[in-house]
Amino acid sequence: MASDWDKWFELRLAVGRGVVLRDVQLWQRRGSSSSRPASHTGLTGRLLQAISLDRLPVWAGRSNSYRCFSSSTTTRAFFAAKLLRRRHRARGLVVELAPTRASKEYLIFHKELGADSHFELCCFTLDLSRKHALDAALKPVLPAARIDTLVLRSGARRRAAENRQDPANTSDARQRFVARLSQCILGGLRLRAVPQARYEKLYRAVFQASEFAFRDELAASADVPFEALQDCVETLLKLFTRS
C-alpha cells in the first residue's frame, strides 16, 4: 500500500444467506483529521440494501471517506459484481455497523473513477446528525423501535393470510418479491424524515401500490429485478411524501 495511506479499520461483513466477507480493509489518506481508532480489527457489520446515491435525501450527510481494499478474492469478487460494473453508475451499498455506542452507524460503499481511469471501491460514513435534529423536532408518537416491530408484524400477518388463501403464494418468486419489496420500503422510510405516526400507513400504501404495479409479473411467477423494485418504491415514496 502506498505510504500516504493508513489502514483505519478491518471489517467483517455479513451479506446474507450465512455469507460473511472477511478482510474488508478501510484506508484513509495520511493526515486525515479523523481520530485514529485504537484497533484496526474487530469491526463487524451487515449489508442492508442497495440504493441510488442520486436519491439520497437532503439531510443525509457524508463524513470519514475511505478507500477499500482486500486480500480476499471472494470479497473482491463480491464488490466487483455489486458495484464495479459500468451499469452501476450511482449504486451504493448500505452497511449497518454493529453498535458500539447508543446510536447506530452506517457506511455506504460506492465506486469512484480513479486517476488511472479505473474504478476504485470507496465508502463513507452516513452523517445522520441533521436527521436526528429533524426527528427530535417531530416529537414522535411512538418509539421508532416499536414502530419497526409493528410494521414487521403487520407484514407477517398479511403474508400469513395470503398464504392461507392461496398456497401458490409460497412460491420462490413470490417470497423473493415480498422480501425484496419489504427491504426497499423499510430502507426508503429510514432514509427519509417521515413522521413516525405515518410510518406504518406509508409502508402499507407503498407495499400495496407496488404489488399492483407488478401484478402481471406476480401472476406469471416471474422474478422482479431488485433495481426495478427500488425504482418503483422510490417513485411511490416521492409521490406519497413529496420528497
Swiss-Prot record:
Cytoplasm as UniProt keyword: yes
Q: What does this protein do?
A: Required for the proper initiation of DNA replication. Required for mitochondrial morphology.
The name this protein carries in UniProt is: Mitochondrial morphogenesis protein SLD7
* Broad class of the protein's primary localization: nucleus
Q: What are its GO cellular component terms?
A: chromosome, centromeric region; cytoplasm; DNA replication preinitiation complex; spindle pole
Recorded hits in Pfam families, A to Z, give: Sld7_C, Sld7_N
Q: Which InterPro entries match?
A: Sld7, Sld7_C, Sld7_N
Q: Which UniProt keywords apply?
A: Cell cycle, Cytoplasm, Cytoskeleton, DNA replication, Nucleus
The disulfide bonds in this chain are none
Cite the source lineage: Eukaryota, Fungi, Dikarya, Ascomycota, Saccharomycotina
Q: Name one GO biological process term.
A: regulation of DNA-templated DNA replication initiation
Tell where it localizes: Nucleus; Cytoplasm, Cytoskeleton, Spindle pole
Which protein family is it in?
A: Belongs to the SLD7 family.
